[in-house]
Structure formats: structure tokens, C-alpha cells
Amino acid sequence: MAEVPITTSNQRSQVAINIANYLKDNKILKQRTGLLNNSEDVEFFRYKRLARALLSDDYKTKQANHKNGLIPIADEQEAAKVFITLIQSQFVIPVEKLHYNEIKQANKSWKPNKTKPTLKQSTKANIEPNAYFVWTYNKPNPFILLYSILLLVGIFTIILFPLWPNFMKIGVWYLSMGLLGLLGLFFLIAIIRLIIYIITLLVLPRAFWLYPNLFEDCGVLESFQPLYGWDEPKKSKKGKSSKSASKPETESSGAATGVKPAENAPTKRKVVLEEVDE
């Protein structure tokens, strides 16, 4: 294990930016999503995979094209030097991947997440194969210029509304009236379905819903499907207690009669979750 003292800087060289752009979404890194300090979603990877990407044939092919601005990398030592420049440019930061038992030891307020590993920022960068690092660099959006131009065009279009021809003004008026009509119809349906629900709740055993998925988290068409539905009755607690009470009775009856369960009968097993590192 080699601990390398590194001083970070806000100055970022163009070479470091080009290499970061190549590595950011590279499949060789096999990046995963983790929780930095148990709060922020980040992409993390192992150093050995980054070195593998820098020494790959794909990198050599793209490095041969001078437009990409990539420097030649011959061996692992040169790959380590390039990686150090990424740390100095604050494109990546070293982290520690915490196991379940280590999360509470690091911070009592942190809660383990079943789907995302918890990562803790480290003050030392260990240039070793299984060392973990997190991206703090985001590639520039190639469509940001197009979005900016469209935004300016939209602003000027609204400002110059008095200069629009009459047919465009009439078209916008009809369009706005149509949208307001749809919005009013939506609120009318919501009020009617609420009134129907309250009436059927007081009169019928089960309440009636018009468009039961209207406010559910689904698509526009799915919100109006099905047309109607009935409110599901709540399960009584007595049924649960009777089921739980029947289990010991069956067990005791088996002990009293002396009948043993079949050997091939399915038995419940405890599920043990084990964290496996890649």
C-alpha cells in the first residue's frame, strides 16, 4: 500500500479535463451508486478498474486521434501519475466503503441503506487496486448551448407579442382557452368523484370511486383507467388473531396424537444477506 501526499488545486489542466471526460462514463470502471456520508448520491469505482481503462486498447485508439487531447500512457506507473493529477484537480476524492457494522461506528445518526453502499470521505489517497474513489466531476452538457438559444428565442417571442400577426394571436388565445377548459374539467371531475365517494360511503357497504387512479403516481392515460372502482374493505384484526391462535392449536394437536411431520415437508429457512464486493 502506497500513501501519496497530494495537494489539491482549483486550477485544472486541459489534459486532466480530457482524461476525466474519457473516464467519466467508461464501462470498464463498472461504476456504482453509493451514498457519500450517508446522504449524497455519488458514482464510485475501484482504482484497479480506472488503471485498466487507461491501459486499454480503446484508450490507445482514442489517444491516437489528436482531437481528443489524450496523452499516451505506457504502464501502470504512468497511469498512477495521471490519476494523481485527477485528485489534484479535485475530479475524484478517496473514500472508504463501510460495511453494515461500521456505519454506526462512523456516525450514530447514519442509517444503513439496503440498495446503496455507504461511503465515507477519506483524507488519504491509497493508490492500490481495491481502493475506492468517488467522482466529483460532471461532464459538460453538449446541449447546454442549444437550450440557452431556445430560452432566449422564447423570451424574445413573448416580449414581441404585440408585434405578432393577428392569426398567431388568435391561435394562442384559442390554445389558452382550451388548456383552461381542460384544467377546469379536471377539477370538476375531482369534485364530482369526491361527492360520489362521500355519498356511497354513507349509504353503501363499500364506497364507490370514479376514476380510482386519478391521483395515483402513473401516466396520463393510466390515471383515467379503469372508469370506476370500489373501495377495498379493511381487513379486521380478529381474522389475524384467529389465524395466529390456530397455529399453536395445530402444533399441540400433532404432539397429542403423536403424528410426526413428513420428512420431505417444506421448512422455513432464515435468509442471510451477505455483502459481496466486486
Curated annotation (Swiss-Prot):
Where found, per UniProt? Answer: Endoplasmic reticulum membrane
What the entry lists under Pfam families is as follows:
Sec62
This protein's record includes keyword NADP: no
| Transmembrane stretches, start-end | 143-163, 179-199
Q: What is its main location?
A: endoplasmic reticulum
Q: Which InterPro entries match?
A: Sec62, Sec62_asco
Q: Which UniProt keywords apply?
A: Endoplasmic reticulum, Membrane, Protein transport, Translocation, Transmembrane, Transmembrane helix, Transport
**Which Cys-Cys disulfides exist here?**
none
Give residue ranges on the Lumenal side. 164-178
User: Which stretches face the Cytoplasmic side?
Assistant: 1-142, 200-278
Region Disordered: start and end of each range?
Answer: 230-278
In the bilayer, the protein is annotated as: Multi-pass membrane protein
A single GO BP: post-translational protein targeting to membrane, translocation
**UniProt similarity note:** Belongs to the SEC62 family.
Query: What is annotated about its quaternary structure and interactions?
Result: Part of a complex that contains SEC61, SEC62, SEC63, SEC66 and SEC72.
> What's the stated role of this polypeptide?
Required for preprotein translocation.
* NCBIfam families, sorted: sec62
Name of the protein this chain belongs to: Translocation protein SEC62
Natural source organism:
Debaryomyces hansenii (strain ATCC 36239 / CBS 767 / BCRC 21394 / JCM 1990 / NBRC 0083 / IGC 2968) (Yeast)
Q: What is the lineage of its organism?
A: Eukaryota, Fungi, Dikarya, Ascomycota, Saccharomycotina
Q: Which gene encodes it?
A: SEC62
